[in-house]
Amino acid sequence: MKINREIPVRQRNIVLIGFMGVGKTTIGQLVAKKLYRDFIDVDQEIEKKYNMTIPEMFQQKGEAFFRQAEKDYIVDLCEHTQLKIVSLGGGAFKQEEIKRACLKHCTVLFLDLSWENWKQRLDILIENRPVLHNRTLDEMKELFEERREIYSLHNSRVETDHLEAEEVANYIVDTLKLGWDLYSK
């Protein structure tokens, strides 16, 4: 059954986008708890569906296979659900169909982090991020800047530099509630 997508703004899925390692999953879980909504990490759901990790999928089936699975899952989620907090993988928003579906049916929040602060997280990120493997720091910065441009289409940008996940989640919840109050009158 397809949901009528002319739903009130407060019932839309909240989609978190941003570069890998910015904290989409951690912050998304906190926001979901505070708003009493279900949390969906797209990468984790794809891993469950195919019974393999994203790095294994890249290695065994290729990036194209993963990107197709990602697109199918996200577009369906946007078109057929509501009241979810959704964390997209860092590269998902590169796909136009995903971007269109998210912007049409959901509220999209860009979690932004400076290159300098992201670089400090690199040691804990690199192992499980196949797209970073075999890249120099300059190539990673180029990817970071390229993706940042892709994330420029969003409903709201949330600066995360020097903030704890809890602080970011509280800011998001407060901002959403204010917006919902304004749009429901």
From Swiss-Prot:
ATP binds at residues 21-26, 129. Binds 1 Mg(2+) ion per subunit. It comes from the Bacteria. PROSITE patterns: SHIKIMATE_KINASE. Gene3D superfamilies: P-loop containing nucleotide triphosphate hydrolases (3.40.50.300). GO terms for biological process: amino acid biosynthetic process; aromatic amino acid family biosynthetic process; chorismate biosynthetic process. It is found in: Cytoplasm. Substrate binds at residues 43, 67, 90, 147. Its EC number is 2.7.1.71. Pathway: Metabolic intermediate biosynthesis; chorismate biosynthesis; chorismate from D-erythrose 4-phosphate and phosphoenolpyruvate: step 5/7. Monomer. This is Shikimate kinase. It comes from Bacillus pumilus (strain SAFR-032).
